[in-house]
């Protein structure tokens, strides 16, 4: 069991397939595993763990970048960047073979059969079917998450001057999940979004629009998702941007004027906290829970052991006795002499410990690196527990 955490993501990454790339002359437009390995390695060094490969009008680079990402611990989503009458859109799919196939089906629907999405020089052509809202709706029908890249750019952004005449209708349609602040930092929509969005709160983010080695990872966004990012996790982040989207603190000087944008210096917790609970034996036998550094909610129906789990934590951490005698009896009944629990925590200095105690009533043991410390548990951890009806 895991918890939601902030992942640093760049959702607009181009490969040498892009005619305007500046990675160097040695790379081919065709998928190259060596380039993919170098790309994800550089992102990994920059702390980025989520990518979307967004080449114009093509998806063939996705498999090699995804493979390199799997080896480097980076989640890679298949995606497209397309131009609809000059307005650019991004469409992202689930990071699976099915997601890749859905993207290919969507791409095939954008031009008549036999018509190439590239011109004679290899440059991507604009979509020949539909307006911005219609193409965005088609992408959603193909299970894509649609974003507006460099949305304030003068010649290609949704809110760029003269780019999309009905940008307000598109912005309020619900078809586009997020809007990239990049393009024109002085754009009015960034400080006065109501003129375009009405009562809708825009989900702002920033991406790299990466085409060169220099600056990789500098323009990226923290997105709060589960420990294994999914397309649904991305969708939920954009739906609840006020709690799940943050720009890196280093970008504050550039984008602090954007209404609604929040910043984060470091997602890693610095306060004392419980980190894991492991129980062997008894009612909760085999339970292993990774605790979030903030609020944790234990959810379940009646009789599933929620209150008992709280009482086990109280008991193992030697945090006193419950006021309710039934609570103590419940713990003894479900956490008997053959059961043992370990509660792991990090103190204010960042040192990691484990408290281990069996259900036989013996004293709790404080361990560090698997070795007993000989110290009383309360010397290193103190918790306040309010059980049921307390």
Per-region residue spans from a language model:
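Charged catalytic cores and adjacent phosphate/nucleic-acid-binding surfaces used
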Residues: 1-37, 41-42, 46-48, 60-108, ...
């Amino acid at each position: 069991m895991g918890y939601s955490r902030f992942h640093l993501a760049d959702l607009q990454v181009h490969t040498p397939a892009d005619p305007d790339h500046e990675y160097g002359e040695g790379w081919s437009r065709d998928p190259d595993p060596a380039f993919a390995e170098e790309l994800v390695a550089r992102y990994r060094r920059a702390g980025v763990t989520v990518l979307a490969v967004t080449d114009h009008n093509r998806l063939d680079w996705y498999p090699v970048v995804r493979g390199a990402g799997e080896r480097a611990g980076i989640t890679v989503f298949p995606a497209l960047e397309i131009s609809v009458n000059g307005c650019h859109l991004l469409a992202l799919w689930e990071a699976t073979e099915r997601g890749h196939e859905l993207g290919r089906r969507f791409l095939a629907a954008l031009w008549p059969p036999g018509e190439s999405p590239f011109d004679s020089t290899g440059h991507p052509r604009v979509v020949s079917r539909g307006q911005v809202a219609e193409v965005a709706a088609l992408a959603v029908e193909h299970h894509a998450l649609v974003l507006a890249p460099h949305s304030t750019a003068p010649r290609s952004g949704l809110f760029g001057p003269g780019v999309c005449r009905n940008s307000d209708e598109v912005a309020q349609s619900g078809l586009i999940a997020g809007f990239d602040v990049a393009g024109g930092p002085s754009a009015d929509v960034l400080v006065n979004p109501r003129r375009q969005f009405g009562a809708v709160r825009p989900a702002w983010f920033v991406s790299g629009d990466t085409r060169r080695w220099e600056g990789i990872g500098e323009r990226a966004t923290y997105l709060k998702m589960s420990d294994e990012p999914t397309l649904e996790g991305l969708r939920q982040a954009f739906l609840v941007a006020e709690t799940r989207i943050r720009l890196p603190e280093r970008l504050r000087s550039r984008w602090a004027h954007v209404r609604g944008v929040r910043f984060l210096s470091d997602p890693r917790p610095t306060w004392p906290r419980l980190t894991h609970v492991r129980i062997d034996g008894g009612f909760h036998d085999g339970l292993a829970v990774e605790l979030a550094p903030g609020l944790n909610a234990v959810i379940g129906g009646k009789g599933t052991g929620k209150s008992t789990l709280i009482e086990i934590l109280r008991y193992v951490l030697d945090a006193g006795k419950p006021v309710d005698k039934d609570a103590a009896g419940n713990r003894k009944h479900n956490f008997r002499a053959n059961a043992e629990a370990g509660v792991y925590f990090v103190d204010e200095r960042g040192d990691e410990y484990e408290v281990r105690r069996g259900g036989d009533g013996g004293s709790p043991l404080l361990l560090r690196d698997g070795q007993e410390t000989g110290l009383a548990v309360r010397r290193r951890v103190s918790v306040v527990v309010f059980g049921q009806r307390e």
